[in-house]
């Protein structure tokens, strides 16, 4: 599989500068993930496709560092960290997408402890085959003989494209065949492969870690979730990069495109479209949405760092809980909003936005996959209203809600009085939404499913409102200190405008969600299947 020629120099440059999967290193001297976040955002803004070649490798190194044996780490990690070898995540199969427990790939024991023979097929494997690295280390889910049904029976295996000898050198081809490359809507240049293992009955792999399945129970899903949790957070950044590029393309275009007269000067000259009211609304809709998502995602990266490195066990547990709650919002809310925000960037371009010569068209296509990767966004909303609402008897989620309440109650200022009042009303509505979900959990589970996505959006909007309003308070303080003539003045003015707009235009959607949930329309459930016509 050949990548675009331009990718090869970029990949080498990233590896030489150690700005790729090297940030996945978890040992002494590691770089905080929150420090890496803006780098990955900029990389994603430059190309949503090429970042996958090192980000998937980073995820694989995370699993091996946490669960691999010392021997496995010594064999694979050095060359994965240098970029000489790539890595992938092999979950999806033709018959096992969101229902991961339906995997049909098999692992058969050999006479060598820890070594298994693999047979099966994986599809939609990002970076599944390419020419940027000399070897690719696949982490494949499969089931051993006697495995339990569903996810409980899944184990995780290290399956290299080319065999790796015990001294870390590369051996012969390991019977992992690329049988197809997908022709995708977006992220062109990122190889999405269908892989067959063991077509010649000669594919082998190591089970990750030392424990074989006990009573048919594997720990592969637990191990893979270490990968997926990080990749879900990264996916939020990938989609944010697309939003960034689309917004700045729209901003640049509206500053030079001259069309129509101002509404306040109908006899005057035609003006740049950035001077028209609705274009300014679209731009601030994008800017505020982009900055809200950035605040949400960067906060989650900080939680992830502190979950590991905070001073006390109690603090580490707290930050781990906060990361767990934020993560589905980072992945799902961000990628849901990406389609809307990049769509607004297209609209700012008018007819030219529909042309492939202009950036927003490809950025829109690129970001669509982010709502599907790492568990579809409905699965993320299920996680949010299910596990995250109730984990540890609901104590962490209640604390999360209380922190937003406390902020709204304690940070009132004259300058932002209207925004704090709107946030207070929004929190009343959000808690009402949470209560309705709790009632449906005990009773009407179909209603809970119908409104899961909107509940997730409601939580994301109030949390982002809190984050942007806290930024606006700081921006107002700095602006008062530095004055309008300071070179950072417009930056701070932009922060204030983003917070005001977001709270008064994005957060207010919560009231519509609350109303719809109270009405409880079930027409989507009641409609006969035959009536979908």
Model-derived features: positions:
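Flexible, glycine/threonine-enriched loop-and-boundary segments that flank and lead into catalytic domains
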Residues: 2-13, 19-24, 88-112, 117, ...
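C-terminal amphipathic alpha-helical interaction region
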Residues: 38, 391, 406-533
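N-terminal glycine-rich flavin-associated loop
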Residues: 52-70, 97
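A structural-propensity feature for long, helix-poor, extended segments
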Residues: 60, 69-72, 76, 81, ...
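A short core secondary-structure module
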Residues: 115-173
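A glycine-rich, basic-preceded beta-loop-alpha segment at the flavin cofactor/substrate interface
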Residues: 163-179, 184, 194-231, 251-274, ...
């Amino acid at each position: 599989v050949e990548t675009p020629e331009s990718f090869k120099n970029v990949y080498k440059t990233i590896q030489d500068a150690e700005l790729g999967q090297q940030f996945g290193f978890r040992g002494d001297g590691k770089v905080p993930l929150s420090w890496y976040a803006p780098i990955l955002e900029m990389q994603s803004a430059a190309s949503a496709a090429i970042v996958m070649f090192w980000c998937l490798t980073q995820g694989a190194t995370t699993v091996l560092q946490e669960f691999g044996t010392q021997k496995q780490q010594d064999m694979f990690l050095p060359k994965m960290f240098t970029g000489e070898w790539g890595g992938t995540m092999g979950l999806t199969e033709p018959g096992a997408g969101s229902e991961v427990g339906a995997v049909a790939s098999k692992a058969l024991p050999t006479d060598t402890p820890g070594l298994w023979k693999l047979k099966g097929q994986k599809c939609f494997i990002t970076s599944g085959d390419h020419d940027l690295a000399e070897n690719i280390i696949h982490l494949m889910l499969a089931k051993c003989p006697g495995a339990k049904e569903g996810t409980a029976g899944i184990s995780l295996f290290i399956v290299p494209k080319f065999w790796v000898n015990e001294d870390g050198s590369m051996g012969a081809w390991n019977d992992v065949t690329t049988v197809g490359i997908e022709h995708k809507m977006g992220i062109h240049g990122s190889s999405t492969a269908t892989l067959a293992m063991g077509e010649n009955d000669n594919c082998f792999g190591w089970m990750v870690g030392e424990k074989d399945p006990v009573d048919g129970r594997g720990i592969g899903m637990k191990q893979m979730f270490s990968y997926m949790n990080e990749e879900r957070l990264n996916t939020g950044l990938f989609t944010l990069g697309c939003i960034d590029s689309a917004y700045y393309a729209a901003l640049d275009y509206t500053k030079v495109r001259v069309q129509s007269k101002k509404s306040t000067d109908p006899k005057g000259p035609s003006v740049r479209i950035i001077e028209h009211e609705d274009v300014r609304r679209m731009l601030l809709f994008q800017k505020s949405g982009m900055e809200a998502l950035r605040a949400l995602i960067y906060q989650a990266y900080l939680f992830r760092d502190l979950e590991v490195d905070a001073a006390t066990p109690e603090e580490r547990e707290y930050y781990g809980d906060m990361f767990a709650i934020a993560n589905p919002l980072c992945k799902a809310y961000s990628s849901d909003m990406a389609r809307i925000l990049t769509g607004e960037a297209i609209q700012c371009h008018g007819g030219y936005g529909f042309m492939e010569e202009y950036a927003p068209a490809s950025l829109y296509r690129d970001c669509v996959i982010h709502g599907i990767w790492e568990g579809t966004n409905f699965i993320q909303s299920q996680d949010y209203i299910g596990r995250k609402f109730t984990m540890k008897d609901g104590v962490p989620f209640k604390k999360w809600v209380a922190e937003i309440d406390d902020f709204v109650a304690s940070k009132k200022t004259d300058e932002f009085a209207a925004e704090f009042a709107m946030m207070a009303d929004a929190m009343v509505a959000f808690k009402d939404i949470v209560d309705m979900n709790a009632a449906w959990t005990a009773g009407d589970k179909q209603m809970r499913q119908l409104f899961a996505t909107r509940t997730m959006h409601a939580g994301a909007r109030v949390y982002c409102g809190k984050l942007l309003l806290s930024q606006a308070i700081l921006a107002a303080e700095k602006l008062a200190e530095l004055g309008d003539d300071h070179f950072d003045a417009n930056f701070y003015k932009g922060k204030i405008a983003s917070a005001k707009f977001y709270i008064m235009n994005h957060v207010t959607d919560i009231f519509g969600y609350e109303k719809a949930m109270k009405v409880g329309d079930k027409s989507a459930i009641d409609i006969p299947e035959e009536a979908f016509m």
